[in-house]
């Protein structure tokens, strides 16, 4: 509450001017429209304003997570958890895309629905259909998220860490890698059926300054060796943390 109280109208205005700035904007339109129609709407809606380059400070981000564990009590019926792996910042352009594809491949191998870990967790009742994984990344940040509902989130995390260590020791099976690679490429192609998804993807690629064709090719060109290297450098215990939301105790 103290931090909210310290926000002034002047600070909000500064944030608004910095964030909602044409120099910081990308417009992507997908659908049955022409460029002339889009530009006509832009000329009508967008007001002339002074633009300035957005300056972002360079932050020396530590490799390790700040806290290993965070726990809160909120009005939920079942405990919810999220395990995160903090990424090393600095990847841009195609390097960031390839890093994302490598991580997606590893997440499927580690805890996708066809993985041994997923089967064990589900059979033992430690996870349900809410279990999901995601890799989020952008300019200067990246994080892998694994979570869902579980009555024993710490046990899930322990089994996940064991699975990571086991895969690191044994290496990635070439046949499994090829199968997952084809699956992810097919998923990437299937998303082109959604106009909304295409627009969102093109916005992401515009900020990364990556061509769509190069993005699609990354799913086929990423190799097994670089995925194993990614496993060794990204899925490390010191960069991991867990956040748990417990139900509020009933009086």
State each model region's role.
Residues 53-116:
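His/Glu-based metal-binding/catalytic segments typifying zinc-dependent metallopeptidases
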Residues 1-54, 92, 98, 114, ...:
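Charge-rich, well-structured scaffold segments of protease-associated domains
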């Amino acid at each position: 509450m103290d931090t909210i109280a310290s926000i002034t109208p002047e600070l909000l205005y500064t944030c608004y001017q910095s964030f909602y700035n044409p120099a910081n904007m990308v417009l992507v339109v997908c659908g049955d429209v022409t460029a002339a129609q889009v530009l006509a709407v832009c000329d009508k809606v967008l007001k002339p304003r002074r633009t300035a380059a957005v300056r972002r400070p360079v932050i020396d981000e530590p490799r390790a997570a700040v806290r290993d564990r965070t726990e809160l009590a909120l009005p939920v019926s079942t405990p919810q958890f999220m395990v995160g792996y903090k990424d090393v910042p600095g990847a841009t352009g195609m390097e960031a895309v390839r890093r994302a594809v490598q991580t997606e491949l590893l997440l499927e191998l580690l805890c996708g629905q066809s993985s041994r870990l997923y089967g064990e967790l589900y059979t033992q009742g430690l996870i349900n259909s809410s279990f999901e994984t995601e890799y989020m990344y952008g300019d200067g940040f990246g994080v892998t998220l694994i979570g869902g509902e579980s009555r024993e989130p710490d046990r899930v995390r322990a089994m996940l860490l064991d699975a990571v260590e086991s895969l690191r020791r044994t290496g990635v099976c070439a046949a499994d890698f090829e199968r997952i690679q084809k699956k992810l490429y097919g998923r990437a192609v299937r998303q082109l059926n959604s106009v909304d998804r295409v627009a969102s993807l093109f916005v992401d690629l515009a900020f990364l300054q990556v061509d769509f064709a190069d993005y699609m090719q990354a799913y086929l060109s990423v190799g097994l060796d670089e995925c194993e290297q990614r496993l060794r450098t990204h899925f490390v215990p010191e960069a991991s943390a867990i956040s748990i939301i417990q139900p509020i105790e009933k009086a």
